[in-house]
């Protein structure tokens, strides 16, 4: 967050006497180069100029500017009028016009220091930093003890990342004026930029000893306290600044940022709404408001606020980077990456942008690049807690679980862990088989942030994986607050059914909420709900509709997106286990709760009659966009040992990836059969599955279809498998005819492939 404005305000600031005004008002200092005017007009010009400068000092800028223009109408080359009219243009946001006017004044009197300092301020406003620095240098060459120029140059150097040089300027100011509260607080800002927080705080405290009611120093002290993690003290400092100056927008902005850090986003938003109302051109407030709106899980509004900030500061790297974060929240990682790359083009060494780029790359399933982005950030700042946590996330994506845990632990040593960091560390522990430690970590995250949905949800998944269904299904309900899942939440006017009241004679909507495999697994509960005497509406994804029409005697089917009639209750499919208090022994686990269409089965039987037995259906990869696809899918080439066997292998893939195309074409020449062009929906696939002798599949919707049909199925699982497959078991209570074969080494499928070959008599 920015501290308060630090550049010396030109000439008319109410906080100090203006060197410009004091050196240009007297008649004895009248511009010797000005065109002579008639004697009777001289007094009129002088009076007009004096009145204009008085109005300027009072802040009545429009009237002052009118006065300066009148003077220039009489005397076009009046140095003072040109200079101060330029200053007034700067103060009214017209920096380009200010530059032109002040440069005209300098041509008339090139040895005056004040115009160069004010010219530098106008260049700063246009982000023409090198020209601004040159102007401040010129002012100080003319007057090495010019405090305003030292102040302005110091602040510019600090903004340019040259904090050590800035500190030297503020020390020079203090040598000239030891009791300058402004120099002391600006010195504190330079020290803060150098990472010397304790010294910075001391400098701000000294400023407040000199001037206890100095809002700027209170605001700057608050920024240091916030950086030190002393949030309550920081908030008190900002509040004190605002008591003294209620319209202090920088303090309002920093107060909001601190409230955001304190997990009080609603209060933060109140401060920010006041800030943007007071200063609609203050980009930092719109940026902070975006941060708070993200915390309030309002990503669309956050993105709009960031874009308002960008309209005001189009070359601000941090705002571009924050736009990227909001776009990631909105599941638009491609656009996010474009915004973040724009930030890095402006500021290549932005730690925030490098971290956000890593997040976008992870969302794009490009974890290797994400890891490299984190490493770049850590080269620039080895103690960046955010970069270490993000590196752990990328390592977790890559299956480098122990390395991820090491990254999280190092981050914990360097700074207090956030709820997100504790949650990610717990995921690593879970993947390492340290489930009780993982649950303790999730609990810590919840203690830190009570409503942190991800921690609750992941804890639920961990408990489900352990077979603790009672607690697991309860916490699984937190999914509706998790970004990426909550967007699928349905808002109905009717009540969510959670097991009570009785359903006899009532109408309930059961609806698909996640993937196709989830719908296939949990549609079994239709019969359980029907047994309660309910009238059922069942809403499913379009590819499943023909297959699930077999429920039409118990439920009226709808495709997602169709208009729905009135109903009394609703329940998403994956909330039904909680509603029915499902535990391991009570899972509805009929051997085959789905059947294929008999007419389609007859056709497939005829088509397969001429193929060598056994006929084995295989699925080696799932949806490439699935979050765990890297770990659950197998490169087809690795299955080569199977294709030397005396058997027919039938591809059950919806599509073949380009990375598998070469192996696929080669295996087709050695007997792999592909019927993809004849499989239009799941009813077609179900009929084909019914006719094969066995299915061998990775964890995808095809596995659930085979299990639901009661086919002998071998499921190939990564070491860190999905919660529904529990731990270590070779069977599953969900599908009695399914056998599970698990990796023993993360990412290594060789042993699994060998075990399958042996179990099928293929070696």
Language-model segments: residues:
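Alpha-helical solenoid repeat scaffolds of the TPR/TPR-like class and their adjacent stem/linker regions
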Residues: 1-694, 699-763
């Amino acid at each position: 967050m920015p501290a308060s404005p630090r550049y010396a305000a030109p000439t008319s600031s109410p906080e100090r006497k203006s060197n410009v005004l004091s050196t240009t008002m007297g008649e004895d200092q009248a511009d010797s180069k000005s065109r002579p005017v008639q004697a009777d007009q001289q007094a009129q010009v002088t009076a007009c100029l004096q009145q204009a400068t008085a109005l300027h000092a009072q802040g009545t800028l429009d009237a002052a500017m009118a006065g300066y223009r009148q003077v220039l109408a009489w005397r076009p080359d009046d140095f003072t009028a040109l200079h101060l009219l330029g200053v007034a243009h700067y103060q009214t946001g017209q920096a380009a016009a200010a530059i032109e006017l002040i440069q005209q004044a300098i041509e008339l009197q090139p040895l005056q220091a004040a115009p160069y300092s004010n010219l530098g301020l106008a260049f700063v406003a246009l982000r023409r930093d090198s020209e601004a620095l040159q102007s401040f240098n010129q002012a100080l060459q003319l007057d090495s003890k010019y405090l305003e120029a030292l102040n302005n140059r110091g602040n510019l150097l600090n903004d340019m990342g040259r904090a050590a040089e800035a500190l030297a300027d503020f020390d020079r100011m203090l040598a000239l004026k030891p009791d300058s509260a402004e120099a002391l607080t600006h010195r504190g800002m330079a020290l803060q930029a150098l990472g010397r927080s304790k010294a910075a705080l001391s400098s701000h405290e000294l400023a407040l000893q000199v001037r206890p009611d100095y809002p700027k120093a209170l605001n700057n002290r608050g920024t240091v306290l916030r950086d030190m993690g002393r949030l309550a003290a920081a908030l008190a400092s900002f509040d004190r600044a605002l008591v003294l100056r209620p319209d202090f927008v920088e303090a309002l902005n920093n107060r909001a940022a601190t409230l955001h850090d304190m997990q009080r986003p609603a209060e933060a938003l109140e401060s920010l709404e006041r800030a943007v109302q007071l200063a609609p051109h203050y980009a930092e407030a719109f940026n902070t408001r975006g941060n708070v709106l993200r915390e309030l899980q309002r990503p669309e509004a956050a993105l709009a606020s960031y874009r308002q900030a960008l309209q005001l500061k189009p070359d601000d790297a941090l705002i571009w980077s924050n736009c990227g974060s909001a776009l990631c929240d909105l599941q638009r990682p491609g656009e996010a990456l474009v915004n973040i790359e724009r930030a890095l083009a402006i500021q290549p060494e932005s730690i925030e942008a490098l971290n956000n780029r890593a997040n976008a790359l992870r969302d794009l399933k490009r974890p290797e690049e994400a890891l490299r982005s984190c490493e770049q950030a850590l080269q620039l700042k080895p103690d960046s807690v955010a970069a270490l946590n993000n590196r752990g996330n990328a390592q977790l994506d890559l299956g480098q679980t122990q390395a991820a845990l090491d990254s999280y632990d190092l981050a914990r040593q360097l700074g207090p862990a956030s709820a997100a960091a504790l949650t990610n560390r717990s995921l690593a522990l879970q993947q390492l088989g340290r489930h009780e430690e993982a649950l303790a970590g999730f609990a810590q995250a919840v203690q830190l942030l009570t409503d942190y949905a991800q921690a609750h949800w992941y804890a639920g998944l961990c408990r489900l994986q352990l077979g603790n269904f009672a607690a697991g299904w309860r916490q699984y309900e937190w999914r509706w607050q998790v970004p990426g899942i909550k967007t699928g939440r349905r808002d109905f006017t009717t009540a969510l059914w959670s097991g009570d009241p009785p359903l006899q004679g009532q109408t309930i909507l059961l609806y698909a909420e996640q993937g196709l495999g989830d719908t296939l697994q949990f549609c079994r509960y239709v019969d359980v709900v029907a047994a309660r005497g309910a009238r059922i509406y069942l809403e499913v994804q379009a590819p499943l509709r023909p297959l699930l029409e077999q429920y039409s005697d118990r439920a009226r089917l709808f495709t997602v997106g169709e208009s729905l009639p009135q109903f009394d209750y609703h329940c998403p499919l994956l909330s039904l286990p909680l509603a029915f208090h499902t535990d391991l022994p009570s899972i509805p686990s009929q051997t085959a709760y789905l059947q294929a269409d008999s007419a389609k089965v007859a056709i497939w039987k005829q088509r397969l009659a001429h193929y060598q037995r056994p006929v084995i259906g295989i699925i080696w990869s799932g949806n490439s966009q699935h979050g765990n696809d890297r770990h659950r899918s197998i490169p087809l080439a690795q299955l080569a040992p199977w294709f030397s066997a005396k058997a027919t292998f039938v591809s059950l893939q919806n599509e073949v990836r380009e990375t598998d195309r070469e192996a696929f074409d080669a295996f087709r020449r050695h007997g792999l059969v592909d019927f993809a062009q004849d499989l239009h929906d799941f009813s077609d696939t179900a009929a084909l599955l019914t006719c094969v002798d066995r299915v061998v599949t990775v964890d995808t919707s095809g596995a659930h279809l085979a299990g639901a049909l009661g086919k002998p199925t071998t499921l190939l699982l990564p070491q860190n498998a999905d919660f529904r497959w529990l731990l270590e078991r070779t069977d599953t209570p969900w599908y009695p005819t399914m056998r599970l074969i698990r990796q023993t080494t993360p990412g290594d499928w060789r042993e699994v492939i060998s075990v399958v070959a042996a179990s099928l008599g293929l070696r």
